[in-house]
Curated annotation (Swiss-Prot):
It catalyses: adenosine(1518)/adenosine(1519) in 16S rRNA + 4 S-adenosyl-L-methionine = N(6)-dimethyladenosine(1518)/N(6)-dimethyladenosine(1519) in 16S rRNA + 4 S-adenosyl-L-homocysteine + 4 H(+). Specifically dimethylates two adjacent adenosines (A1518 and A1519) in the loop of a conserved hairpin near the 3'-end of 16S rRNA in the 30S particle. May play a critical role in biogenesis of 30S subunits. It comes from the Bacteria. The keyword rRNA processing applies. This is Ribosomal RNA small subunit methyltransferase A.
């Protein structure tokens, strides 16, 4: 078996760390787990003894067949062969439909989790987009590049602070569980990795009137993160809000001419995005 580089495959070969991922997720007997990147089924097998239902997705046909044999004893594990994403911003319909179906037949207090050693090349779209799916996850425990994990937990003024930091922290409590060196993977990646746990705070998420608008607008605001905030907002709102309306919003929120998006904290960004949304609605 050879890793396929286009799939971003780096297999975690330290069983103690595989067990740490499962343990960090605190999976209960009525919980539903989504795993992206089945691999040979090592993590899946551990979780199968803990979860009420598992949906595991593997893009590599050879690995899918190998894992199918490994997971055959577990009838509550459903496998899907193919790409988890329909495009960069959307999960495949059958994946979320399978999650909804599993949730409908398990107790009301069951949790939905993403637990996975994620392929590096899809980690950001997988985590970012899962947070505004139906149903949204309750917890995410994933192995990703260390740099990506640091971006998720970064604060204002940090070099790692950006759209991903805002999006994750607007909906989750985030922590880095463990930093992993390249030596615990095969083949060895060129960078360190991290096990990251995100506990989704549904109250925080529900306080955002339009999650999709929030996500898209935050990404636009940080596209040129070091530019002055006014020019960034004008660019992001082009054809949607005129300059006087934008200047009124920035003035009302107390953002001066030299303000930059990378200096604003989560509350300030949230207030700005909501003010822009309300102004757009008033324009309709």
């Amino acid at each position: 078996m050879r890793p396929v580089s286009k799939y971003g495959q780096n297999f975690l070969i330290d069983l103690n760390l595989v067990e740490l991922i499962a343990r960090s997720a605190e999976i209960g007997p009525s919980d539903i787990v989504l795993e992206i990147g089945t691999g040979v089924g090592s993590l899946t097998s551990i979780m199968a003894s803990q979860a009420g239902a598992i949906l595991t997705v593997e893009i590599d046909q050879n690995l899918f067949q190998l894992a199918s044999e490994e997971l055959a004893p577990f009838p509550h594990v459903k496998m899907i062969q193919g790409d988890a994403l329909k495009n960069k911003s959307t999960f495949r319909d059958d994946i979320m439909e399978s999650i909804r179906e599993a949730k409908s037949r398990l107790p009301d207090d069951s949790k939905f989790m993403l637990v996975a050693n994620l392929p590096y090349n899809v980690a950001t779209p997988i985590v970012s987009n899962l947070l505004h799916q139906d149903p949204p996850p309750d917890r995410i425990v994933v192995t990703i590049q260390k740099e990506l994990g640091e971006r998720m937990v970064a604060g204002p003024g940090s070099k790692d602070y950006g759209a991903l930091s805002i999006w994750i922290q607007a909906t989750c409590r985030a922590e880095i569980v463990r930093i992993l060196p390249p030596t615990v993977f095969w083949p060895r990646p060129k960078v360190d990795s991290a096990i990251v746990r995100l506990d989704v705070d549904h109250e925080r998420g529900n306080a955002i009137p339009d999650l999709k608008y929030f996500h898209q607008t935050v990404r636009a605001l940080f596209f040129h993160r070091r530019k002055f905030l006014r020019s960034v907002v004008i660019s992001a709102m082009k054809g949607r809000l005129d300059k006087p309306a934008i200047d009124e919003i920035l003035g009302r929120l107390g953002h001066g001419e030299t303000a930059r998006a990378e200096e604003l904290n989560l509350e300030q960004i949230s207030d700005l995005v909501e003010a822009l949304r309300q102004a757009e609605l008033a324009n309709e």
